[in-house]
Every structure is written in structure tokens, then in C-alpha cells.
Amino acid sequence: IQSLGGQLLDKSNAINELDIKVESLTLDVSNLNSQLKSRELAIKDLSTRLGITQSEVEELTPVVKSYFALGVSGNKGIVIPLEVKMSKGTGIVSVNIKNVELKSDAQDSIRIATKVSQDYTGVDLSEKDITVTFVNDNPFIVSLDGPSAGAAITLTIIAGVLDRTPSSAVLITGTIESDGDVGPVGGIEEKASAAASEGAQIFLVPVGQKVNSPGIEVAEVKKIQEVVNLVLK
């Protein structure tokens, strides 16, 4: 009997030890679950912060679009690389030039281009700084009538707002009016020849200024909407 009682006591103690181990394991599992939940919350918080940071980075990163304007040097047309850079700002519009002589009304033309771009896209540009750059890599100065590049500038700003790419196969000359009309300019024949030499397939001109030019199709446009449809990819 004493032996049986001892065995029962040993089994009882073993059961108690198992109960203690089970309670300990249960507590460990509970602590582990708590730690996992805490880490999940930390990961979610970090993801949210990274998302905000990524959004801020995208907002601060300038948008740059490249196209071409056309000028005249003597009796020869010249294709001039044009770049528009847009970044977060306060509505400042500025111009950079290299070996390019701009007429005094160029700044006004760019401001009109900005307004027309805003009207066309429906995007408020008052919190964007816009820099328009003309670079002539030739060793001589090229004269560029500011208004005559208005349509090209407008198109490039619109490309920046819509994040689309202007096609170099279609070039344009023409002023831009506040209502979105493309207005008349000079030097059409010289510019058409330069556009063809640059490899363009189509040269867009204001209504009433179409000319015949070897090696390139010359087409008339009236509104900036037509230009966007033909040039932006």
C-alpha cells in the first residue's frame, strides 16, 4: 500500500510539473503573440512613414521635358533644343539661355504659355516654379523671337504637367495667344528647311502660313489642342 501511495504521489507531482510547464508555455505563447502584434504595428507605422517620404520625394523631384524651338540666323533656320523644368515652388517663371538672343517680350510669351497650359490641363501652376532653357551649341548667336517659340513652349509645359513626351518627329513654330490660338510668325521657309534637316517628318505652322518645303510635310494648326494631339506621345 505504501508503495502504491508513493507511486500515486510521484504521478501527482509529475502532473503538477506538467501543469506548471503548460502554464509557462501558455505565457510564452501569449508573450510571443504580443511581441508579434507590436512588431506588426511598428512595421505598419514604418510603412506609413516611408509612404509619406516617398510622396514627398516625388513632389520635390523636378519634372523635366525636352523639345525644340526654331530660330533664324541670317537667312538660315536653326533648331534650338528647348527644356522645361517644373518643380514645387511659388509660381516663379524664369529663362536660361546659351548662345541665344531672345527678344525682350520672351518673358511675357512664357507667362502666356504657362497660363494656356494651366487652362488646358486644369492644373493650378501657381505652386510650381517653371524654368525654360534654350541651348544653342553652335559657336554663333542665334536670334529667337520669344513669341515665335510660344507654341513650342506651351506644348512642352503641357507635356510636363501631363507627364507625356513630345515627339521630335513633329516640330512647330508659332506664337501662343491667351485663348490657345497659334499665331503667325516669320521665317517659315527657313524654319521648315531646318526642321527637315533635323529629321522631323512634319512641321506645324499657323493657319495661312503653309509653304512647300522639300523633305518635310508642312501642316497648319489653329489651336494648341491640335498641337497636343499631333506631338505628344
What are these regions (language model features)?
Residues 2-233:
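Peripheral, non-AAA+ core regions of ATP-driven protein-machinery
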